Swiss-Prot record:
Location of this chain's protein in the cell: Host nucleus
UniProt-listed GO biological process terms: DNA replication
Protein name according to UniProt: DNA replication helicase
Enzyme Commission no: 3.6.4.-
Disulphide bond pairs: none
Family named by the database record: Belongs to the herpesviridae helicase family.
Gene3D superfamilies xrefs: P-loop containing nucleotide triphosphate hydrolases
A single MF term (Gene Ontology): hydrolase activity
Record-level GO cellular component terms: host cell nucleus
Alphabetical list of Pfam families matching this protein: Herpes_Helicase
Superkingdom of origin organism: Viruses
Subunit structure: Associates with the primase and the primase-associated factor to form the helicase-primase complex.
């Protein structure tokens, strides 16, 4: 008998699994609280943090590129910096995030993640306000864009018998180029008293989500900066000698930390696999023993993302390294469909394709775009991407690397993966041909070279953003039912930070105002409906009427004005059309013909306006629902904030006022969006970047229009990013990229999908995969939320694959250890 059958189907399996694990998840709080109470047995040397010797010189006396923190002549060897660690691992979708939620709710802790997507996802899960967004662990300890090009170095290893003290120094030495730069800047900032208190001074409990994708030396880097910052600012944590507790969360069988190096002289890139934090804590005897992993390991067992019993059993066999019995291999056969079916973009349109390599993803997009171009050209958007190369800086760069024959175009093609988010250019259908032109200034001088490429996207396709991007939410597109549900639940208001609440109320009022006329224009509207609509009580709003009396009907509104003249709605309609719609005029717009500026009203007045419009809107909705027996609610509502908006056949969305007025928001990587189109109109709050040359706007720089999962429409700001390369300690700002920071979610690599929950998945393992790994099979198949929505071109378990799950024996050993906390 299944658990759910005991409850008569009242609760689903996912709910029951989460509830059954809740009591033990709460025990994690006690475990972390206990570890975070540890204190130093003795004090660290006084002022140890002001002048620190490069740890590499302790292993290699002939090391020529030593970098000391502070003043070289005062530098002393780095003392050992103690720490505690707790390991929280589990199968995909097992509920590890629940443990983070519980810790955040019950303890004063610093919650971080290793990637932007994971950080934004946690911000959503924890319902963090704009001012308290979860940061990446890199940003938390002070990493910034100037450190991207700083190379990691190899540490000299004298022998294999290493203590934890030596291991810590060797790990820090690998990352010392970055560490020393951040530390020197922090010392300078304190001297100038310009630095705010760093995040690592807030608590001794530091949570790192998705710890399986960062290299092991980052663990010791976090420990170093905890002690460094707290010593620098003389915090109570430091004065009391509180030892940091690092909570490392992730799935060790999904770990995939990479070491990337770039040779400026040859312009060649080298990528190889490194040892991640989770693997180091589990497999490294020295580190594992010091952190007492045998006593400090929590394992989540059941997959709660997909509660299908057979599928969960299959995933657990891979997770724990159990032998794959013939019946399990036969079980996977049911997901197989022909490769030609999966590779045809016209099949399974709403399904996300996963591939092993970036080239396969790119080829799929090209095939998809070719078909769309033939079947419906207007659904294929082609957007320009610009790269501004600084000519003088490029010449200085050539001199520094000693490659005087290097030209801009070959350099660009070799470095495009470094100029912005790798997957954006590695996966997408970016034009092979590039256009180079020199930007000539008014005095005739040439300082920059402009490179133009083109990027393709499909209308109504699923997209994501590569980083947190400023946007202006301007409208709504969805059913009437959905919009009324949002109004009644106040979901939009709840998801808005407190400091933005007045703007949220004003924005929703503008949407209701713009959509109110649609009740009279609906195909379901009858004379009886119109009479009932006219009988709806519309209270007098004193401040609105006084505002109207101050407005002359002849005054022209400016682009940034929130006033809205409903007469614009009827542009293009004849008098006969208007009479057929409503011969007596809509009483709503007779009483409330204009909306005042948000900044001219108090919060109480905006709230009253919102409540009044909401009551009228819902009353009109109820009337039409009653007369149509619920059919009206299923119809489409498209409304924009205080604006009339139209769409051209080519996908361009334009305002009749030549300007969009919306609510300032942000698009984040954790969310899914639909590409609605693009606009060339002005967007209030976004404006133009004055640092960019005007030639870009003359050539064309559209903004993308997207829709979120709730149905709200936003205009994305353009993404401007700088590429700074570091060679021999010298920084070179070589390029500024102007693009859209978007990636299609129609297809991606299996590696990139890690950590995502996907409704429908189609995996293409290739025709004859040479480097197929068990971890790739596991990650790809475990993304799906329902195995009925999973298809694959082959059964990968019947192919030759590398069993790279070297963690499994350690997990099995931990499962047998009575000190391991198991959460089912």
């Amino acid at each position: 008998m299944s658990i759910s059958s005991l409850f008569g189907g009242r609760y689903d399996n996912k709910f029951l699994l989460n509830m059954s694990s809740a009591p033990k998840i709460e025990l994690i709080v006690d475990k972390v609280a206990s570890l975070s109470e540890r204190r130093l047995e003795g004090r660290l040397p006084e002022d140890w943090f002001r002048h620190i010797m490069d740890p590499e010189t302790e292993f290699n006396s002939e090391f020529a590129d030593a970098l000391c923190i502070g003043i070289d002549e005062f530098a002393q060897p780095l003392p050992f910096l103690p720490f505690k660690a707790l390991l929280v691992t589990g199968t995909a979708g097992a509920g590890k995030t629940n443990s983070i939620q519980t810790l955040a709710a019950n303890l004063d802790c610093i919650v971080t993640a290793t990637t932007s997507i994971a950080a934004q996802n946690l911000s959503v899960v924890l319902n963090r306000s704009k001012s308290a967004q979860v940061k990446t662990i890199f940003k938390t300890f002070g990493f910034n864009s100037s450190h991207v090009s700083m190379s990691e170095r190899q540490s000299y290893i004298a022998n294999d018998e290493r203590s934890i003290q030596i291991q810590q120094k060797q790990d820090l030495s690998i990352y010392w180029n970055v560490i020393s730069d951040i530390a020197d800047r922090a010392l300078g900032a304190v001297a100038c008293k310009t630095k705010e208190l760093p995040d690592l001074c807030e608590s001794s409990v530091i949570v790192i989500d998705e710890a399986g994708v960062i290299l092991r030396h980052i663990l010791h880097t976090v420990v170093f900066f905890y002690w460094f910052y707290n010593a620098l600012y003389k915090t109570p944590l430091y004065e009391d000698g509180i030892v940091p507790c690092i909570v490392c969360v992730g799935s060790p069988t999904q770990s995939n930390a990479l070491v990337t190096s770039f040779n400026p002289l040859t312009q060649n890139k080298d990528v190889k696999r490194g040892i991640d934090v989770l693997s180091a804590l589990i497999c490294d005897d020295v580190l594992s023993k010091y952190c007492e992993v045998d006593n400090n390991w929590i394992i989540f067992v059941n997959n709660k993302r997909c509660a299908d019993h057979a599928f969960g059993d299959f995933l657990k066999h891979i997770e724990f390294g159990l032998p794959l019995k013939p019946e399990l291999i036969e079980y996977v056969d049911q997901f197989v469909k022909p490769a030609s079916y999966i590779r045809n973009p016209m099949n399974e349109i709403e399904t996300t394709r996963l591939f092993l390599s970036h080239n396969e993803v790119k080829n799929y997009f090209r095939s998809l775009h070719e078909q769309v171009e033939v079947t419906n050209r207007n659904n294929l958007f082609v957007f320009p991407v610009y790269f501004l190369i600084k000519n003088k800086t490029f010449e200085d760069y050539k001199s520094e690397i000693g490659n005087f024959s290097l030209e801009i175009e070959p350099w660009f093609k070799s470095n495009i993966h470094r100029l912005n988010t790798y997957s954006q250019f590695a996966d997408q259908d970016l034009s092979k041909t590039v256009q180079l032109e020199e930007i000539v200034l008014e005095d005739g001088s040439v300082e920059e070279t402009l490179i133009t490429c083109h990027l393709k996207h499909i209308r109504n396709s699923s997209i994501g953003v590569t980083s947190k991007i400023k946007a202006s939410t301007v409208g709504f597109s969805g059913t009437y039912e959905k919009f009324v549900e949002l109004l009644q639940s106040d979901l939009f208001i709840e998801k808005t930070s407190c400091d933005q609440t007045i703007h949220a109320y004003s924005f929703l009022s503008g949407l209701m105002f713009g959509g109110m006329y649609s009740f009279c224009c609906s195909k379901f509207t009858t004379p009886e409906v119109l009479m009932e609509i006219k009988n709806i009580k519309m209270p007098s709003i004193e401040f609105l009427e006084s505002e109207m009396s101050r407005m002359s009907p002849d005054v022209q509104t400016v682009e940034t004005d929130e006033r809205y003249d409903f007469g614009l709605v009827n542009d293009g309609l004849s008098d006969v059309d208007l009479l057929e719609i409503d011969p007596c005029g809509d009483p709503f717009f007779t009483r409330y013909s204009k909306l005042p500026l948000t900044n001219s009203l108090s919060f109480e007045e905006i709230s009253l306006l919102y409540t009044t419009f909401k009551d009228i809107f819902i009353s009109r909705f109820a009337i039409l629902q009653k007369h149509t027996k619920g059919k009206f609610g299923k119809t489409l509502l498209v409304t924009y904030n205080r604006n009339n908006v139209s769409r051209k056949q080519c996908g361009e969305i334009y305002s009749h006022l030549k300007s969009f007025y919306g609510m300032l928001t942000y698009a984040i990587p954790a969310n899914n969006y639909t590409l609605e189109g693009y606009t060339n109109d002005n967007v209030v709050h976004l404006g133009t970047d004055k640092q960019l040359p005007q030639i870009l706007y003359k050539k064309g720089l559209p903004r993308l229009v997207i829709k979120d999962e709730m149905g709200f429409i936003s205009v994305l700001d353009n993404n401007v990013s700088k590429f700074i390369d570091v060679v021999n300690g010298q920084s070179f700002h070589l390029c500024t990229t102007v693009d859209y920071a978007t990636v299609s979610k129609v297809s991606m690599t299996i590696t990139k999908s890690q950590g995502l929950s996907i409704q429908k998945v189609a995996i293409d393992f290739g025709s004859d995969p040479k480097n197929l790994k068990l971890s790739s099979i596991y990650v790809g198949m475990s993304r799906v939320t329902d195995p009925n929505n999973l298809i694959m071109n082959v059964n990968p378990l019947r192919l030759n694959y590398e069993n790279d799950n070297f963690i499994a024996p350690h997990i099995v050993k931990a499962l047998k250890n009575e000190n391991t906390m198991l959460i089912f």
